[in-house]
């Protein structure tokens, strides 16, 4: 706003939990049956912060043209296979790093998924997840933001504070409030586990 012919910028800040999301994948029931055998199901190892989401005991080796990475499956089953890795890990696998929202998989690289009982080749589904914020409709109103809005998030207080831009807001009654960064982003800010950050408007 303007006051006495001077431009005054008002920056709104809201504190929110920040989590590091390491590499993982989501699979369909059909893919899981091929990888682990008919009749097998996902084993809940640990509940995650997002309601209904859990890390599984079962792991899959993701194979690219240049290398491979073994990672955990996150449950429950999804309608489509999706592999989420960091930009650094795209180089290890030898695939193009494509930054996308979860579920936006058209035109993304594929890979081979290898389990103890078989393997599946997918022609798309490997993404570097766009950094994002999960909010309920109530917290979105409280923070003054809306679904698909792009905001900034400030994290780190150990001499490596970083302000991340291009953070997309995702609003759903199924969510719990949290910012998700990948391991490259968390390492850049020197984050150690779950911490607090500030949404900057």
Outline where the language-model segments fall:
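Short, Lys/Arg-enriched N-terminal segments with co-localized hydrophobic residues
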Residues: 1-11
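Generic structural signal for short, solvent-exposed loop/turn connectors between secondary structure elements
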Residues: 11-12, 140
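Generic N-terminal amphipathic, Lys/Arg-enriched alpha-helix
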Residues: 12-20
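Short beta-strand-centered segments at strand-helix junctions
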Residues: 17, 24-64, 71-116, 121-148, ...
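Amphipathic terminal alpha-helices
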Residues: 157-159
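Short coil-to-beta-strand transition motifs
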Residues: 161-163
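Short beta-strand-to-coil "C-cap" segments at the C-terminal boundary of structured domains/repeats
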Residues: 199-201
């Amino acid at each position: 706003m303007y006051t006495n012919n001077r431009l005054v910028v008002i920056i709104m800040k809201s504190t929110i939990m920040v989590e590091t999301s390491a590499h993982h994948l989501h699979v369909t029931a059909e893919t899981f049956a091929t990888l682990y055998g008919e009749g097998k199901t996902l084993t809940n190892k640990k509940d995650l912060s997002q309601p209904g989401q859990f890390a599984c005991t079962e792991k899959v080796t993701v194979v690219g043209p240049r290398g491979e990475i073994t990672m955990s499956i996150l449950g429950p089953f999804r309608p489509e296979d999706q592999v989420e890795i960091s930009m650094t890990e795209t180089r290890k696998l030898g695939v193009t790093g494509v930054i996308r929202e979860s579920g936006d998989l058209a035109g993304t690289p594929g890979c081979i998924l290898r389990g103890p009982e078989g393997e599946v080749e997918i022609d798309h589904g490997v993404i570097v997840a766009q950094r994002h914020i999960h909010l309920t409709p109530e917290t979105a109103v409280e923070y003054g933001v809306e679904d698909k809005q792009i905001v900034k998030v400030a994290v780190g207080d150990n001499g490596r504070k970083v302000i991340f831009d291009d953070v997309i807001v995702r609003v759903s009654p199924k969510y719990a409030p949290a910012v998700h960064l990948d391991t490259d982003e968390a390492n850049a800010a020197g984050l150690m586990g779950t911490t607090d950050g500030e949404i900057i408007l």
